């Protein structure tokens, strides 16, 4: 899919829905929201109890009556209604009105036409705006300040929570790409397994993630 800078330049919001975290950026302001992609609901009436960081803190601690889920899997919607509820709340935090909003929403390069349409439908249901899909490697390159329209090829490796995408981009498009379901979440599980095997100690996902960030980051986070 060829990237359209003219459409992208007119967008109000940039939205990245990841398996682990959701980020929203505003034109001219940069990232204005970063929250976990987690939703907690009451299993009896399906009412949303908590979203984002509050919901993430409930993982492994919630009673049986509360279901804590990640509605995004591998960059693709796995629970439409919960994703709508989550994104609706997030968007309302960063804009006063949803009228006239145009958003650029990140989608995996390997996403099918059905998956892309589902992402657009979800965004429209959440805040009723025009949606411009942007392939994940292109969005990552733009975020790094690379000139995606130059004839010089760039290799982009984007490791998220549920998937890692590797792509070669040039002249505003993706020349070749590969997506693998081996990323940050799997790293966390490997850390949990190692600590249990090495020290016979059981740690949770939040602790494993913190270990990964503190030890595995090339730059302080």
Where are each of the predicted segments found?
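Nucleotide/phosphate-binding catalytic cleft detector across ATP-hydrolyzing
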Residues: 1-159, 167-221
């Amino acid at each position: 899919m060829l990237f359209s800078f003219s459409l992208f330049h007119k967008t109000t919001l940039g939205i990245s829905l990841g398996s682990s975290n959701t980020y929203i950026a505003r034109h001219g302001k940069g990232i204005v929201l970063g929250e976990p992609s987690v939703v907690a609901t009451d299993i009896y009436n399906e009412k949303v109890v908590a979203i984002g960081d509050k919901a993430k803190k409930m993982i492994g601690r919630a009673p049986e009556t509360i279901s804590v889920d990640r509605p995004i899997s591998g960059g693709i919607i796995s629970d439409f209604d919960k994703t709508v509820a989550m994104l609706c709340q997030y968007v309302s935090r960063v804009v006063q009105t949803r009228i006239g909003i145009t958003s650029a929403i990140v989608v995996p390069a390997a996403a099918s036409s059905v998956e892309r349409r589902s992402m657009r439908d979800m965004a429209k249901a959440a805040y009723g705006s025009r949606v411009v899909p942007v392939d994940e490697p292109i969005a990552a390159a733009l975020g790094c300040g690379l000139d995606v329209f130059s004839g010089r090829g760039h290799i982009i490796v984007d490791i998220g929570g549920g998937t890692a995408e590797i792509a070669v981009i040039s002249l505003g498009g993706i020349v070749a790409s590969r997506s693998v379901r081996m990323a940050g979440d799997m790293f966390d599980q490997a850390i949990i397994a190692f600590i249990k095997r090495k020290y016979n100690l059981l740690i949770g996902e939040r602790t494993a993630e913190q270990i990964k960030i503190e030890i595995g980051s090339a730059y302080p986070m």
